[in-house]
């Protein structure tokens, strides 16, 4: 006997096929090309109705995930009377799950079964007598909307969008703030150029403009809420002797409007930064503890989502953000970059130049572990303990490389000291002599240390003198050898000249004799 399991928006339908080997038929499409043929081939054997829309959504999600729900299992157990029966299902995952139940079904799910389902879905209202086409389409539409809402609600990727958009907006705000602040200083600098040198903070500069206006009102304006007392005095003194030009009320109104924008942008930037920090602590607490909110958010934004970043190996996380440098190095066969976005992490910043690459590698390895726990842990703890432990290990490694004292891990719990009540001790006069002896012994130790230092210094001085003397002797010997060589060369030259003169003289005398 062959059965076809059909999932509808109203419930599970188990159809009984008249042909036992219908799924093996070579002319299946021609056999099921009309309503009469489909109704002749399939009859309704059992139907399990969904009680509510929530129940329908739950059962549909089970089918999508390839799981057998209790309702479906009960339906199949009631229909397993024939030991040699075959069950045709649409999903391969669902077929594997039904096989694991140990029911007396030969479960089939392949390309041929899709043709059976195509015919069954087309004539489904005719196969199910209690349902008409209009009701079935309405139920299907409602179930489709419910599934869509469920996917949007529980999608982990959608949560990452908040972080990605927030960090992108934060970077844009920083650029805008810098541009506006520079323009404001240049604009107001014509009227009060000395203010930019005294007040370097852009937001404080804008707030001073809003509070003071023209520089002539500076003496009567209270700037204590914006500036410290010393800086306020300097500003007021500079305003009295300023070399700036005068400006009109229209100019001042426009400058104030720009300053107001700067103050508003700065307040919104702080609010956005707090929001990003809270979202990062909620979504990736361990990564946040390890590298910080901004670096962690940039890593997630660069990768696209928390899941895709968690799937990346540590070597990829290490150079994430330095792709151009990496491919340029591979093309020119030079050394590849040691860090990308991780360069801005505080732990990498604490390391010296030669150790930055090593710390970046260790940090990337620990970040990969923290990310996988944040993204994939079923019963995740949001305290960030794993990130804290990983940070402590990276700090210990940094201390080891830099030659500093090793730091203890943050999870070390020290027992509280027990307070014991004892009797008050009487004054012991003998302890005074002991203290004097101890101080004397301490002074002896100090004298011994000083003697040792003096001996070391004397030995070092002797060695330096000996080295200098040896160098002088070597130099003197070299000079003597050079002089001897020069003299030998000179003597050889003189001998040669004498010989040449003698030869010339002999030749001349021979000619005269002839």
Curated annotation (Swiss-Prot):
Tagged with keyword Nucleotide-binding: no
GO-annotated cellular components: box C/D methylation guide snoRNP complex; nucleolus; small-subunit processome
Acidic residues composition-biased segments:
439-450
Instruction: Quote the SMART domains the UniProt record gives.
Output: NOSIC
Give the principal location in a single coarse category: nucleus
The protein's matches in PROSITE patterns, at most eight in alphabetical order, are given as: NOP
Q: What InterPro entries does this protein map onto?
A: Nop56/Nop58, NOP58/56_N, Nop_C, Nop_dom, Nop_dom_sf, NOSIC
| Residue ranges of every copy of the Nop domain listed in the record | 283-403
Q: Which SUPFAM superfamilies match?
A: Nop domain (SSF89124)
| Record has Transmembrane helix as a keyword | no
Return the annotated region ranges for Disordered: 430-514
Any one GO biological process: protein localization to nucleolus
Basic residues compositional bias, start-end: 454-477, 488-514
User: Subcellular localization, per the record?
Assistant: Nucleus, Nucleolus
Q: Which UniProt keywords apply?
A: Nucleus, Ribonucleoprotein, Ribosome biogenesis, rRNA processing
GO MF terms, alphabetically ordered: snoRNA binding; snRNA binding
Q: What does this protein do?
A: Required for pre-18S rRNA processing. May bind microtubules.
What PANTHER family does this protein map onto? NUCLEOLAR PROTEIN 5 NUCLEOLAR PROTEIN NOP5 NOP58, NUCLEOLAR PROTEIN 58
Q: Which family does it belong to?
A: Belongs to the NOP5/NOP56 family.
Q: What is this protein called?
A: Nucleolar protein 58
Q: Which organism is it from?
A: Vanderwaltozyma polyspora (strain ATCC 22028 / DSM 70294 / BCRC 21397 / CBS 2163 / NBRC 10782 / NRRL Y-8283 / UCD 57-17)
């Amino acid at each position: 006997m062959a059965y076809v399991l059909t999932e509808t928006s109203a419930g599970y339908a188990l159809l009984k096929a008249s042909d036992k080997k219908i799924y093996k038929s070579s002319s299946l499409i021609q056999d099921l090309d009309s309503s009469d043929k489909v109704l002749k081939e399939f009859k309704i054997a059992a139907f399990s109705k969904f009680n509510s829309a929530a129940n329908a959504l739950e059962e549909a999600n089970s089918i999508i995930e390839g799981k057998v729900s209790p309702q479906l299992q009960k339906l199949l157990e009631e229909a397993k009377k024939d030991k040699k029966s075959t069950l045709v299902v649409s999903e391969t995952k669902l077929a594997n799950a039904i096989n694991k139940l140990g029911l007396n079904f030969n479960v089939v799910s392949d390309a041929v079964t899709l043709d059976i389902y195509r015919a069954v879905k087309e004539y489904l209202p005719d196969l199910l007598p209690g349902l008409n086409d209009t009701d079935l389409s309405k139920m299907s539409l409602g179930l489709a909307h419910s599934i869509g809402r469920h996917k949007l609600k529980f999608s982990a990727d959608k949560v990452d969008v908040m972080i990605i958009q927030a960090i992108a907006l934060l970077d844009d705000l920083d650029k805008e703030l810098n541009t506006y602040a520079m323009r404001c200083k240049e604009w107001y600098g014509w009227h009060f150029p000395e203010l930019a040198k005294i007040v370097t903070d852009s937001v404080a500069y804008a707030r001073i403009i809003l509070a003071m206006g023209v520089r002539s009102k500076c003496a009567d304006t209270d700037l204590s809420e914006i500036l410290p007392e010393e800086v306020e005095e300097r500003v007021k003194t500079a305003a009295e002797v300023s070399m700036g030009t005068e400006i009109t009320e229209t100019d001042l109104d426009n400058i104030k409007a720009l300053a107001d924008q700067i103050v508003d942008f700065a307040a919104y930037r702080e609010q956005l930064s707090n929001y990003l920090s809270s979202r990062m602590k909620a979504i990736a607490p361990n990564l946040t503890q390890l590298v910080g909110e901004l670096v962690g958010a940039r890593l997630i934004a660069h990768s696209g989502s928390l899941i895709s970043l968690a799937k990346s190996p540590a070597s990829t996380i290490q150079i994430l953000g330095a792709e151009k440098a990496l491919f340029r190095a591979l093309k020119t066969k030079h050394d590849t970059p040691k860090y990308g976005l991780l360069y801005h992490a505080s732990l990498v910043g604490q390391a010296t130049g030669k150790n930055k690459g090593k710390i970046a590698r260790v940090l990337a390895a620990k970040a990969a572990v923290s990310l996988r726990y944040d993204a994939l842990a079923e019963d995740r703890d949001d305290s960030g303990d794993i990130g804290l432990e990983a940070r402590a290990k990276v700090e210990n490694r940094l201390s080891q490389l830099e030659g500093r004292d090793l730091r203890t891990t943050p999870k070390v719990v020290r027992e509280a000291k027990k307070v014991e009540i004892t009797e008050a001790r009487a004054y012991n006069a003998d302890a005074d002599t002991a203290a004097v002896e101890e101080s004397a012994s301490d002074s002896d130790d100090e004298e011994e240390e000083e003697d040792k230092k003096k001996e070391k210094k004397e030995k070092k001085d002797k060695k330096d003198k000996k080295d200098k003397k040896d160098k002088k002797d070597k130099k003197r010997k070299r000079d003597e050898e050079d002089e001897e060589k020069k003299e030998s060369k000179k003597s050889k030259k003189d001998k040669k000249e004498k010989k040449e003169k003698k030869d010339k003289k002999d030749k001349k005398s021979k000619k005269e004799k002839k």
